[in-house]
């Protein structure tokens, strides 16, 4: 059940959410996804102009996943998405990771609950 409410206060209105998440990086996106699955109303706030967290901010030459294996072994947004997404490399570049995270945000309509 979604419990977002809105109240008038002075010159504006105040919105109330079940949960507020700071940061639209991988962890924040996963929190949004999971909290929504629990039926909660959620708002994510981020200072960046796009989703991705460190993958949005760090665009220096050579930025990439430096650990072995799948880059998101801890965060599975959905099995279907993992099966259909084709990672070109086992250690993808910053651009590839950011493209994936933007796809996740679009796929799960996350932008409606993220304020950048």
Pin down the residues of each PLM region:
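A structural signal for short, well-ordered beta-strand segments and their strand-loop junctions
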Residues: 43-46, 115
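Glycine-rich active-site loop/strand segments that organize a redox cofactor
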Residues: 41, 49, 56-100
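N-terminal Rossmann-like FAD-binding beta1-loop-alpha1 element of flavoenzymes
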Residues: 14-44
